[in-house]
């Protein structure tokens, strides 16, 4: 099964960004933040309604966090490997992915990791998607997931598939990665389910 985005690809790009950002001045860092914020306010934002999905299951781990997905969705692993937690509806179209950016992924020390903020990581992901030939449109927005403020990278693939990536820092200091990809019809119900159900501990 093949999904649009590979977290390993994003991590390589974030590694370069993190290594660069740790040596930047505060002025340069502020400039990057402003750039992403201007992008988010200038672009459209998806309006999320209440999810109508009632029959759900909790997926995830203590390392990656937990979300609810439809009970009929199944776990799968990429043929090329990777450490994502992924569930799909039985097709290669509608997919939820969970992961966490760790210091070793970003190529930084624990102290450098603690000094990073979500906008730095999200800006790198945003730029990677913008430069990809797979997408016809990429824009940024802000939202809340599990009560946390998140930077959201929204993409429309050339085949019409949508990709939504939430990047945020949870209260345990970890940078979280959650993505949802699929058709507009599926995203309509899945978006609020993901945003309302994410938690870093299983209830």
Regions flagged by a language model, labelled:
Residues 73, 174-203:
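Surface-exposed amphipathic alpha-helical segments
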Residues 71-72, 90-93, 146-148, 168-175:
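Short, solvent-exposed coil/turn segments at beta-strand boundaries
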Residues 1-4:
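Positively charged n-region of N-terminal signal peptides that target proteins for export
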Residues 52-58, 81-84, 144-154:
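Short, hydrophobic/aromatic-rich segments at coil-to-beta transitions
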Residues 62, 66-115:
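Secretory pathway targeting signatures of secreted, lumenal, and periplasmic proteins
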Residues 122-168:
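Signature of long, low-cysteine stretches enriched in small and polar/charged residues
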Residues 6, 24-70:
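N-terminal, intrinsically disordered, polar/charged segments of Gram-positive cell-envelope systems
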Residues 16-19:
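C-terminal motif of bacterial Sec signal peptides marking the signal peptidase cleavage site
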């Amino acid at each position: 099964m093949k999904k649009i985005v590979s977290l390993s690809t994003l991590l390589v790009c974030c590694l370069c960004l993190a290594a660069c950002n740790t040596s930047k001045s505060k002025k340069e860092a502020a400039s990057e933040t402003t750039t992403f914020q201007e992008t988010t306010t200038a672009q459209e934002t998806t309006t999320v309604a209440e999810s109508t999905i009632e029959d759900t299951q909790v997926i995830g781990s203590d390392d990656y966090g937990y979300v609810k997905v439809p009970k009929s969705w199944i776990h799968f692993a990429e043929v090329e490997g990777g450490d994502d937690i992924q569930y799909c509806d039985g097709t290669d179209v509608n997919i939820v992915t969970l992961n966490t950016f760790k210091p070793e992924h970003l190529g930084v020390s624990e102290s450098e990791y603690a000094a990073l903020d979500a906008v730095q990581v999200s800006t790198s992901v945003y730029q990677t998607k913008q430069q990809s030939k797979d997408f016809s449109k990429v824009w940024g927005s802000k939202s809340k997931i599990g009560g946390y403020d998140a930077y959201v990278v929204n993409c429309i693939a050339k085949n019409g598939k949508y990709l939504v990536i939430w990047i945020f820092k949870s209260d345990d200091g970890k940078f979280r990665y959650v993505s949802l990809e699929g058709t507009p019809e599926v995203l309509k119900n899945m978006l609020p389910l993901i945003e309302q159900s994410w938690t870093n501990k299983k209830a």
